[in-house]
Amino acid sequence: MFINEIGWPGWLAMMLLIVAALLMVVHVSRWITNKRVSLNRSRQLKALATSMVFLWTAGLLAYMFALASGSGTFHSFELLFRSALCSLGMFAFQVDGDVFANITGGNDAPLIRGIISVITVLASLLTVLLFVSLVAHRLWAYLHLVFSTIRATIFPRRRLFVFFGINDASKVLAEDIRKTQKENDYSIIFVETPLTEDEGEQGSGIDSIMSILTHRAETFRTAAYNNALLSIASSRLSDLSTSDIEADNNVLRSIGVGLLARIVRNMHKTKNAEAHYFILSDSDTDNLNKAGVLRLDSTIMSAAERGVKTTLYCHARYNSAHRVIEDEACGENIDVRIIDSSRICVEHLKQDVSLQPVNFVDVEQDGTVSSPFNALVIGFGEVGLDAVRFLYEFSAFAATGSTSEKVERSPFHCDVVDNRMDILAGKFYTNTPALRSLPVAPRGELTQEKADNSIVLHNFDARSAEFSKLLLDKIKTLNYVVVATADDTLNITLAVRIMRLAIRYSQRPQMLRILVRVHDRSDGNIDIVADHYNRLFKAQNDKETLREERPDGPITLFGDFASIHTYENIVSDRLVREARRYLDKYNNRYPSEWKEDWDARHRRLLGNAKDSHLSPSMSDIMELRRKESQDIANAKHAATKLLLAQKAFEKSGKDGKAKLQELRSAITNGAITREFGKTSYTFNTPNSSSNAQPSTFSSLPSILASLAWTEHLRWCASHEVLGYVYGDKKDEARMTHDNLVSWQELTEEVQSYDCNVVDVSLEEIE
């Protein structure tokens, strides 16, 4: 037999052939035994690769037979390597003619030629299949988009969600849209850009060609998973700038997504059509540039003018520089929204009633607060800065002992730690001149605290000895901790360390909450750590705690990608929706000449109420931002006021929830009334439609007064974190306000505005 004549190379080839055959059998058996496993892209490539290895080894062995049967003689290694090269050539549609022609061996020669021919045909076929599999996804995506474009022309969908680029943010948001939208009246389209130079677009040879043809496998998987269309642009949107855009310039067509432009062009045929465009990359600069370019696209502008509600979502920090694109779009048919993930993180804290500062102080029978609120913020980046602002505003309570002649804020103290504080503090000082803060200490020194300081900034690392000293000094009375560094592992490590110290040294460890910023919770590892230590904390006082419990302990995780990028937060914009509803209820307590809804205010300050050729002033912009931020804060702070009233009732030994419900019913049904412009309430005999009883009214004057004081203190704190200071008159451009004074210095009419906010907060939701 020829294999004995070949020697060890033949036996090696035979072993490789057997291994390849076994691999094929394993793959086929898996598919047969589990029919539910789909033949996805990965499995297709594995099947092709296994088959190609099998054919290559078969060709290797066949060529060994062919060479050994010829007239020449070969060294063993020469025979092995030449056969291997000849076998590889079969996948490139090549047959070694010299070897093929010189095959001898009598009756075996036709058989060897036939085997080589069959293997060559099969190998060539696999090469074609491999090429097709690599480009099939892109071809199918294009055909799918073409068919959808034709369908959209005839039967356009009401809502369109377009994502420019595929990253973690766009994938999470698209998935949430798919899961939460019950009506099948929308389409999701991913516009993916060409591969960058680093990813091989500018490479040479076969690598460059294959990169262009195959694109990213993850791109196609993401589109398929979300039942989305995929349009791959021929050029990058970031290569354009607003200065390049001329009148009637079709940006979508210029970057090679003309089919998307056709879909947008036909959307006006559907009633209440909406088009949402998302630019959510990690680069603020690129996002702002892309949003500016898209806003000038002739197709998008035309659709907006024809009644399609058009919104551009741009991921960037919500600051004065980046808000320019929102201001420029005001008055146009296209709405531009800045999506600040750090801001949304902290808004989540406000949304969760259990995390509001009112839960970590002592509330007395009159609704005042008798204990200090002591906080620690680790990391003074975007999230840390917003957390400081949140705590300063939402921990503004009327101190026990306050009277209408002298209302004071309950003690508040916040230590902020960051190893780059010498750089970060400047912005904080500049933007919030009203906040009393100490100068930043040199690196390595502990800032000396003074009694009249509310916020103290420390310039050292959270792993330093200085931080340990600070923590040991503060842990006894610490109420609230926010850990918001850029390192998730460091964040949870610090949280566990603080919790362990609180168990050892805190006077009231049950009054401590540790908020931990976690960017990615997909693997669940940090959740396991948090649940473990929360369970240990609960079991310390509750011996019946079960091992599988996930108790609500001191450590709370927040700010992960999936919880931020949701339909509710981004598209539905829950913050603005709740603020609008709150403003409507607030306006109902004013005479008709005072009423101005959300949209009317926009039109008055920035929109159609102005001459289209005139620019809004700085005062217009600042007034709009200030009032809208107050509407949002009022909506969120309502929970604090309700909890203050409930805790006040509970302090007097009553059923807090029941008494709070009686109070809300009395306010809603007119059992408790107040004249416009006045602060005193009239307690009427409860009517038949109210559940309130006369005994409920006995302690209410002091509670309602405390709530109004608290609202004024919150209002002052919110304006201070916005950057406002006291002035003889209100000047939006100079950021001065004449109401930034103590409660007792206000006129009764101005005080009644705070009472209005309290009344709206107490009203039952219809």
Question: Residues of each region from the PLM?
Answer:
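Cytosolic regulatory regions of ion transport systems
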Residues: M1-G59, S69-L80, G89, G97-P686, ...
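Alpha-helical transmembrane segments of multi-pass membrane proteins
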Residues: A62-Y63
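Short interaction-hotspot residues at assembly and binding interfaces
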Residues: L605, A609, D728-V741
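Charged, low-complexity interaction tracts
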Residues: S718-G727
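Amphipathic alpha-helical binding modules
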Residues: H737-I765
